[in-house]
Amino acid sequence: GSLCGDTCFVLGCNDSSCSCNYPICVKD
């Protein structure tokens, strides 16, 4: 549910603990 300091595209998130909720990465 928290935001990651990352945006996601086809390749996903730089932080492997985050998931893509386009266009942002989220974690918990």
Swiss-Prot record:
SUPFAM superfamilies, per database record: Cyclotides
Post-translational modifications reported in the UniProt record: This is a cyclic peptide.
Keyword Nucleus included in the entry's annotation: no
Cysteines paired by S-S bonds: 4-18, 8-20, 13-25
InterPro entries with a match to the protein in the record: Cyclotide_sf (IPR036146)
Coiled-coil segments on the chain, per record: none
Keywords assigned: Disulfide bond, Knottin, Plant defense
Keyword Disulfide bond: yes
Protein's GO biological process: defense response
Cross-link type Cyclopeptide (Gly-Asp), residue numbers: 1-28
Family: Belongs to the cyclotide family. Moebius subfamily.
Annotated function: Probably participates in a plant defense mechanism.
Domain remark in the UniProt entry: The presence of a 'disulfide through disulfide knot' structurally defines this protein as a knottin.
Protein name per Swiss-Prot or TrEMBL: Kalata-B12
Organism annotation: Oldenlandia affinis
